[in-house]
């Protein structure tokens, strides 16, 4: 019998230390281009935009670093905004506050807008959101959620702003690209 995936447990990172960006956590972190040149052959089964936005940029703070990179499979998909918002689950994120989120990302509304706002304000985001397939649901904070099929791995800010735009009747044109990961840990 298939089991739901337990989000509310702490799993150790299994990412190979050799993949850690040089200078991670400092102002001298190597560029993605340098990092990719060193690691592309090891990660060649994954798209470069996924590797840049998730593994490289979020090396020290991804709660999904327990996923074995070598066995991940992926699929690039395109979704409409409302369908995406209905279909994805945001673990560990708490409640959304659309008006606050809108103001946070808009800042003063000019060139100082957050990059997420600048991208979505012209139709869609600049990097695909990364989602994890959870075919049997999840357990989050002790609550069983059997209908959850997709959990946000990377893209929480894009999710917050997309939600704010939809709630405030300002939905971006879209469509929105996502990368759906599948792991042998969750089957």
Regions found by a protein language model. Give the residues of each.
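Generic hydrophobic secondary-structure signal
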Residues: 30, 48, 130-131, 152
């Amino acid at each position: 019998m298939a089991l739901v995936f337990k989000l509310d447990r702490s799993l150790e990172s299994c990412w190979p230390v050799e993949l850690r960006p040089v200078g991670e956590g400092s102002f001298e972190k190597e560029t993605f281009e340098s990092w990719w040149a060193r690691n592309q052959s090891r990660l060649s089964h994954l798209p470069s935009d996924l590797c840049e936005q998730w593994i490289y940029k979020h090396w020290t703070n991804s709660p999904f670093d327990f996923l074995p990179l070598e066995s991940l499979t992926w699929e690039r998909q395109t979704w409409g905004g409302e369908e995406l918002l209905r279909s994805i689950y945001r673990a560990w994120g708490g409640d959304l506050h659309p008006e606050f989120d809108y103001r946070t990302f808009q800042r003063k509304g000019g060139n100082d807008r957050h990059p997420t706002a600048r991208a979505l304000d012209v139709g869609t985001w600049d990097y695909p959101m990364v989602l994890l397939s959870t075919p049997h649901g999840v357990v989050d904070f002790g609550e069983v959620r059997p209908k959850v099929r997709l959990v946000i791995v990377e893209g929480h800010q894009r999710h917050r702003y997309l939600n704010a735009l939809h709630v405030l009747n300002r939905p971006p044109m879209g469509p929105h690209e996502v990368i759906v990961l599948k792991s042998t840990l969750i089957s």
